[in-house]
């Protein structure tokens, strides 16, 4: 029997699904774990489990049972303290348990970037209570950005433009966080010209970068991305310096999604994820190796010899307007008729308001055409 490596994913969404597919292409046995049944990666993995991802005992039980070669976190909300213990016992966490813990919430990584590494970031304060939040907002000034320390896909984020918004912004953060009634970060509002993701790969042969990905966010969640994003040479060098500094500090092998603000005067660090990034779905149609293929090669210890941009491209996610227990995705025939366009339907068991259910991906001779075509394709898709 073929003796393959075993990879266990903690988190089994649409990004994890692509990781599983790429791992299987290299003969890897895959195990998908998440908090709900029939998650996207579970549909293609060799084995799967449903657990409370924040319960250390449940996480340990599955890992000890499966004894994987690699533990690959695909979401933030995991019992990371248990991963630290498991790593000490000899299990291999990607990129490492410290990075998983630091990036689990916004406080650890922000303090590391700004206070330890001295990277340029927006000004920030933290608050545990509503009274502390009022004081933090007053200190940062208006407008300011309010985020729960732990959330996914931008849930719970809002812009607080004046004192009149304080109560609603606090409630939004409390409702949107992974941990209810949790801590929040209040950030200075940076008047940026654009937001980018710089996909950064740490592999056995060094650090490599993908072309920058531009994106548009709404309520903290991406609604469009494109690659490449036009930047000056100085901006590119500054972005690469920031990305290499933060990823070198985190260490380990794998792909990191480094989010940055481009302002007139400088590049600001925003966040980093030690895993494939949602805005990077566009690389499925733009690069010789997608972000998922790069991640898998790097974590398996293979060198990254080249990353080639094959074409400009763009992505547009389909988000559910409401919760539906039973649904279909209509309009695929028309969406797929758009030139050089693909659609990936994630197959999530139910919809929830704002949940990503599919993505339109378009390649073209220019970013502008790709963005237009991705929008055309998305406009054909309807959830019913």
UniProtKB/Swiss-Prot annotation:
Q: Which residues bind N(1)-(5-phospho-beta-D-ribosyl)glycinamide?
A: 14-15, 74, 278, 348, 355-356
Taxonomy, superkingdom? Bacteria
Q: Work out whether the entry's keyword set contains Magnesium.
A: yes
| Pathway membership | Purine metabolism; IMP biosynthesis via de novo pathway; N(2)-formyl-N(1)-(5-phospho-D-ribosyl)glycinamide from N(1)-(5-phospho-D-ribosyl)glycinamide (formate route): step 1/1
Residues annotated to bind Mg(2+): 259, 271
Instruction: Report one GO cellular component.
Output: cytosol
GO terms of molecular function: ATP binding; magnesium ion binding; phosphoribosylglycinamide formyltransferase 2 activity; phosphoribosylglycinamide formyltransferase activity
Record-listed ATP binding positions:
106, 147, 152-157, 187-190, 195
Alphabetized UniProt keyword annotations: ATP-binding, Ligase, Magnesium, Metal-binding, Nucleotide-binding, Purine biosynthesis
What is catalysed by this protein? N(1)-(5-phospho-beta-D-ribosyl)glycinamide + formate + ATP = N(2)-formyl-N(1)-(5-phospho-beta-D-ribosyl)glycinamide + ADP + phosphate + H(+)
Q: Which GO terms describe its biological process?
A: 'de novo' IMP biosynthetic process
Similarity-based family: Belongs to the PurK/PurT family.
**According to its UniProt entry, what is the function of this protein?**
Catalyzes two reactions: the first one is the production of beta-formyl glycinamide ribonucleotide (GAR) from formate, ATP and beta GAR; the second, a side reaction, is the production of acetyl phosphate and ADP from acetate and ATP.
Its quaternary organisation is: Homodimer.
Full protein name: Formate-dependent phosphoribosylglycinamide formyltransferase
